[in-house]
Regions:
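Short, ordered coil/turn segments that flank beta-strands lining enzyme active or ligand-binding pockets
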Residues: 106, 156-157, 194
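A short, polar/charged loop-to-alpha-helix boundary motif
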Residues: 123, 169-180
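Short coil-to-beta transition motif at edge beta-strands of beta-rich domains
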Residues: 150, 170-175, 225-227
């Protein structure tokens, strides 16, 4: 799976940042890699179902398998499972979904897995263990740093208000900008890869009435009609 993971997940991760967007590699991995591999292995072992440790739940609604949030809303992982197909969900069990994380840890200790229960949690992307995606992009894209350095920060009027190290190193909604633009907090509200600019605005500027979406899964519905 290493080659397929590199092409489907890592290459997409890099391409999205270069396109000025922020990717979520876990969604793609679940959709295109993890479930396919697990079910293939399950078929080899003549297993009807697979179980994963995701904090989410599955219910049948109108003949369709629908993902719901786990009982533990703090640890909920339903949002990274939206792309998993109906066929895959029909063979999937989420035993963790009806528990809180603290309950799982107590169960692990009671069953003799105390060291596992006390293991620190990881929030990093699996292929970026140091969680430094900027350095990762620089290693993956030859000459990236030289190409995107000395980009312009713009205000909402399009005026240049400062310099940055490259648009791929920012994400919409980001507040930590490496410099101050006044007394009030500033946020990234726009990224333009074509001219290497990052637009800065207020938190209110992040509020939008229109958004563009793609790769939609309607959950309870197989499709929706226009109008």
């Amino acid at each position: 799976l290493r080659e397929e993971f590199g092409e489907s997940i890592i290459d997409n991760f890099v391409d999205e940042y270069i396109s000025g967007r922020t990717p979520n590699p876990c969604v793609l991995c679940n959709t295109h890699i993890k479930w396919e591999a697990l079910l293939k292995r399950a078929d080899m072992l003549n297993c009807k179902y697979i179980a994963t440790g995701h904090y989410a739940r599955i219910r049948q609604v109108n003949g369709r398998y629908v993902i719901y949030k786990g009982v533990d809303e703090i640890k909920d992982q339903s949002y990274v499972l939206w792309g998993v197909s109906q066929d895959c969900l029909s063979r999937t069990i989420f035993p963790m979904g009806k528990y809180h994380k603290d309950e799982i840890k107590r169960l692990a200790i009671d069953l003799g897995y105390e060291s596992l229960a006390k293991k620190s949690e990881s929030y990093e992307i699996c292929f970026i263990p140091d969680n430094d995606y900027r350095s990762f992009l620089k290693r993956r894209v030859k000459g990236l740093e030289e190409k995107v350095q000395n980009g312009d920060f713009l205000n909402t009027s399009g005026e240049v208000i400062g310099k940055h190290d490259g648009y791929p190193f920012f994400t919409i909604g980001q507040r930590k900008l490496g410099k101050s633009f006044g007394k009030k907090p500033s946020y990234v509200i726009g990224i333009d890869p074509s001219n290497n600019t990052v637009t800065i605005g207020s938190k209110q500027d992040l509020n939008k009435q229109i958004m563009h979406i793609r790769d939609v899964n309607f959950g309870k519905l197989s499709s929706i009609k226009d109008g």
